[in-house]
């Protein structure tokens, strides 16, 4: 019973975040600030969301999903997706399918290395995330594309190792 209550609360929090997004969607984000068009989801919560309860409940037409709590982050200079993230990706696939989204996978890096190298590394990360989504069952027609932002859109400072780790990430842009 406690798990059902927790799942219901998490589902409601997700809906609240989506509705908050809908209200603030008209604003254009700037580089280092947290983007207002981003739905940040704690991955532990995302693993437990009952996707069927979210279907058709004010799901926005466009939203960017970033899984927080140091999830789907990459090691320095790596484009490999850790198997511990596969469950989270399966739930993302279900969310995409239930809400009839298409996804653009966007790769990001920290600021170490040249801009040219980081753009290529970000693209490899996005391509590997796309490949894993397809391997885990997402239909190819649900993939809108892959992009790299390299080091151009940090979410944390690049002056510390902790900040750089947060910047090495994947974002999923969902569009209806």
Residue map of PLM features:
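Sec/Tat signal peptide C-region and signal peptidase I cleavage site
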Residues: 20-24
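Glycine/serine-rich loop-strand microenvironments at binding/catalytic pocket rims
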Residues: 86-119, 175
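Generic marker of residues within folded, mature protein domains
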Residues: 15, 55, 64, 93-95, ...
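Bacterial N-terminal signal peptides that target proteins for export
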Residues: 2-9
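Structural recognition of the beta-strand scaffold that forms the well-ordered cores
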Residues: 66, 73, 104, 145, ...
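Hydrophobic helical h-region of N-terminal Sec-dependent signal peptides
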Residues: 10-18
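Periplasmic peptidoglycan-binding/tethering modules of Gram-negative envelope proteins
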Residues: 26-101
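Periplasmic OmpA-like peptidoglycan-binding domain that tethers envelope proteins to the cell wall
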Residues: 108-176
């Amino acid at each position: 019973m406690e798990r059902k209550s927790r799942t219901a609360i998490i589902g409601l929090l997700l809906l609240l975040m989506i509705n908050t997004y809908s209200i603030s969607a008209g604003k254009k984000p700037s580089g280092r600030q947290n983007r207002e068009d981003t739905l940040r989801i704690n991955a532990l919560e995302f693993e437990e969301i009952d996707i069927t309860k979210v279907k058709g409940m004010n799901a926005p037409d466009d939203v960017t999903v970033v899984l927080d709590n140091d999830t789907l982050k990459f090691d320095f200079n790596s484009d490999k997706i850790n198997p511990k993230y596969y469950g989270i990706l399966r739930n993302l696939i279900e969310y995409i399918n239930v809400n009839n989204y298409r996804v653009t996978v966007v790769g990001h890096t920290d600021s170490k290395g040249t801009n040219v190298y980081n753009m290529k590394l970000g693209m490899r990360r996005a391509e590997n995330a796309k490949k894993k989504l397809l391997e885990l069952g997402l239909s190819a027609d649900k993939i809108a594309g892959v992009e790299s932002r390299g080091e151009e859109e940090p979410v944390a400072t690049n002056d510390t190792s902790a900040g750089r780790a947060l910047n090495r990430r994947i974002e999923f842009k969902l569009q209806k």
